[in-house]
A protein has these predicted regions:
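Conserved donor-nucleotide/metal-binding helix-loop-beta segment in metal-dependent transferases, i.e.
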Residues: 100-123
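Surface-exposed alpha-helical segments enriched in charged/polar residues
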Residues: 25-29, 80, 110
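Short, surface-exposed basic-aromatic patches at helix termini and helix-loop junctions that form
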Residues: 52-56, 84, 107-113
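Hydrophobic/aromatic beta-strand patches that form the interior of the parallel beta-sheet core
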Residues: 36, 91-93, 118-119
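N-terminal anchoring/stem segment of glycosyltransferases
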Residues: 1-67
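The conserved acidic donor/metal-binding loop of glycosyltransferases
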Residues: 94-98
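Amphipathic coiled-coil/heptad-repeat helices and related helical stalk/stem segments
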Residues: 19-20, 44, 75-78, 101
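A conserved donor-nucleotide-binding helix/loop in the catalytic core
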Residues: 65-91
């Protein structure tokens, strides 16, 4: 299995948006994966707006649905958005997780095909 994209998401709660430049850089430099952030909010914070100007396909703004907490929306969209990414093999991750070892996220997947669902948790 060859991952083609990593997907992370966040909203305005916490400092998660400010982590994305490092998260994007680490996924690319360690695993050679392109990382995309989905931000749930009415507008992008400056850090993501600036990043989007450099890497237009790396940041997506998702306007929040009314009466549903944006943190919950960010969690759900990260799980559901890959269904819209045709012809991609997507690894979903938390915004505050960066790869430290290529073997864990690249070589470990070599024995799987794109029809498999692989989880890195025991839940």
């Amino acid at each position: 299995m060859k991952i083609t994209k990593v997907l992370v998401s966040c909203d305005s709660h916490g400092d998660y948006a400010s982590m994305f430049p490092l998260v994007h850089k680490m996924w690319k430099s360690i695993c050679d994966y392109d990382c995309i952030a989905i931000y749930v909010g009415t507008s992008l914070p400056a850090v993501l707006e600036n990043f989007k100007n450099k890497f237009p396909d790396s940041v997506i703004l998702y306007k929040p649905l009314p009466n549903i907490h944006t943190t919950f929306q960010a969690q759900c969209i990260r799980l559901l958005y890959p269904a819209l990414m045709e012809n991609e093999t997507v690894l979903i991750s938390d915004m505050d997780i960066v790869p430290l070892k290529k073997q864990h996220f690249v070589e470990l997947l070599d024995s799987y095909n794109k029809e498999n669902f692989v989880t890195y948790t025991d839940r």
